[in-house]
């Protein structure tokens, strides 16, 4: 309520304020969803920061605190702009744009940005990535191992780091080139895809416009492997807006009390599972032999008989 009061002070008291409210991501939209909608209805401006976000970033606190769906809840509020960045430069770029839109352009929007409870090194900001960060995805690293087989790896939040590690294994051990895409907002990509699809349907006599996802991926080779620290419904949002074979992975199910490493293994979003799933996806496209995927499954001791995590 205090955040809403500050976020609407520009109209109620003629005082411009940009409030920043940091909270446990699980205790945001899930616990006070009515207030989030009230913020949208009242045209509040400001930043909501969902800390300790993602199903596996908060180790040891089980199902009550491990967030696998706050981004999906945020996606339903029309004037809520939501992001799931991985690195500090992404967060800074998003904050700067948010200040520009809300303070300079006077747009009646508010931002939901998730932040992880995990320490890791942050790389130098790549050149010319601001537009991609804000639109929802950009090419973090291009596979240049000159391998004959290519794959497109998409990741957001803390799981992008598992994607990066998986790409290194694929390159060194399997001679597979992976283009790594940092997806800062599956939600914004979906909104762009929906708008583009609608525009094309309303203009049947014109050349179809490409969604931003299509612009990024259409000229790239290989299937798409997308993973996040949220349920598969989060990454699945962009499936209709790419023509490529698309595989999504996430953390469907209840949270569990364990280490980050074990949690990611359980939910099958660690680097080992991503490597094995990527090889299987490539085998289905007849780009690698199925025996390579079988060997990887055995090598990483992945239990084929284990039930789907959401059923456990």
Model-derived features: where do they sit?
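Single, functionally critical "micro-switch" positions that shape active/binding sites
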Residues: 86
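Thiamine diphosphate
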Residues: 1-76, 82, 89-99, 164, 235-236, ...
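Secondary-structure boundary/capping residues
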Residues: 48, 82-83
